[in-house]
């Protein structure tokens, strides 16, 4: 998908799990203003579909992808509060001229991104970002972390210029201003929990 103003280009290679019909292929257009690319599965999409249907939303597919778009239309950025599953997604809201995305609560699905001026790139694999950016530099901090702990903690990656969206975070990228803002929509709640009993 390429927007009329050439500001947004979305691509997707789909592994069909729920709705195998080509009508559910991605990038998926919910209407003329809402488009989505989505990696994962929403486990409670049938319950959401029923709830949204009672609010007047209609559906042309049996996919969880379409339900996510309707949830965004109804709840805006709060839609992630209703999703139970593993996911990384980006919604292009043409009317508001923004990209809205999120990563699931436990970070099961990966989400890498690169920002350079007004250039915002994202992918589920870091190699996809590498294809278009040949001057990425290796992060010594990330090498040290990997050699010490066997992992590179979010939001860092092996490259200085590429970051991971943290688990349980959502973001908004404003296409007009080029501003990128992320925030947690979920975190573990330890309040009132006795973690140590001695």
Describe each PLM feature range.
Residues 1-198:
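Cysteine-centered catalytic environments shared across enzyme families
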